[in-house]
Regions:
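Extended, loop-rich substrate-binding clefts of extracytoplasmic carbohydrate-active enzymes
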Residues: 85-158
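Beta-strand elements of well-folded, non-transmembrane domains
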Residues: 134-138, 150-154, 168-172, 192-196, ...
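Trp/Gly-enriched beta-strand surface patches
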Residues: 184-263, 268
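Beta-strand-rich recognition/accessory modules
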Residues: 234-308
């Protein structure tokens, strides 16, 4: 039996949508674009500035995914969490961005911000492809061109893969990036929604300690989220072609997985030289153990090697 679920403001969906349904994009507002697979929501890409009542005005942000949904319609991500207002679903930002003798903070959105410029590709059918051009701006000055590609594969019985490519190009002047001192965060980040029974699994195991400045090819967070009858979660896989593979991470059991590249050691990039970063976000039903995660990472490696 199918039941109605609340998915997005003003939008309802039927549970139990069939695997193999086609993807479609749908505007949520003049600021946000939703992706659906059949009757099931996949994510919302917020490309214009999002604000929240009661939150300091300088926490306004754009260029991130939230909500990101599990396979049963549960919301996996959080936005404007009270403990870290600047956290924003699935996002990519650096706390130290230096150029032209000045330093900016994309992570805390201080002095610089990411801005949407144009859609490059928006295709939906048996799979979905979204390619966006953004800019990093310090006031009116654009310092980095950012191209984001999201390739979403059809849901399988118990998982879904979202491939992400970030291409960053410094413009007039060199740009130096660095992660947070003593922690390494800075780069792709996934902030999870409130949940219970959290387990973070990496190739090092699934202990309860947080991992700062730790080199990993992948990390997963599994838990019980509101709206789901069983545990679920999401992993981030890093492409073997990634610079300095495996990169540093920061994992936190309060609910965040943070890539840390280039990590605590700053790296300078010259104008017009592109930086290419590839990842897969692997969403799954049930808690994922190390064996299942290793197998899914192997599938990702093979897909990259064959171009599929």
């Amino acid at each position: 039996m199918r039941t109605l679920l609340r998915a997005l403001p003003g939008i309802w969906l039927l549970s139990g949508g069939a695997i193999g349904a086609e993807f479609r994009f749908e505007a949520v507002s003049e600021k946000s674009l939703a992706l659906w697979e059949g009757a099931k929501p996949v994510f919302v890409y917020n490309y214009r500035v999002i604000r929240k009542e009661g939150v300091p005005a300088d926490r306004a942000r754009s260029t991130y995914l939230h909500p990101v949904y599990g396979l049963d319609g549960e919301v996996l991500t959080d936005d404007f969490p009270k403990d870290h207002y600047h956290h924003r679903g699935l996002f990519w930002a650096w706390p130290h961005v230096k150029t032209g003798g000045k330093e900016y903070d994309l992570w805390m959105i201080k002095g610089a911000e990411q801005r949407f410029e144009r859609w490059l590709v928006k295709e939906a059918g048996q799979k979905a492809l979204l390619k966006v051009e953004n800019g990093w701006y310090a006031g009116a000055k654009k310092i980095v061109q950012e191209q984001v590609t999201l390739e979403v594969h059809p849901a399988e019985a118990d998982s879904r893969a979202i491939d992400i490519e970030l291409v960053l190009t410094p413009l007039d002047q060199s740009v130096t990036l660095a992660g947070a001192e003593g922690k390494s965060y800075g780069g792709l980040t996934l902030r999870f929604a409130p949940r219970t029974n959290t387990v973070i699994t990496t190739p090092l195991g699934n202990g309860q300690e947080d991992l700062p400045m730790t080199r990993l090819p992948w990390a997963d967070l599994s838990a019980e989220f509101a709206g789901a009858k069983q545990a679920s979660g999401a992993a981030i896989f890093v492409a073997p072609s990634h610079p300095d593979f495996p990169p540093m991470w920061l994992t936190r059991h309060y609910g965040v997985l943070c890539l840390g590249w280039p990590g605590v050691d700053a790296r300078t990039f010259e104008p017009d030289k592109t930086i290419r970063l590839q990842y897969r976000v692997w969403i799954h039903r049930a808690a994922a153990d190390a064996g299942r995660l290793k197998q899914a990472f192997s599938v990702y490696e093979k897909a990259l090697a064959t171009g599929r």
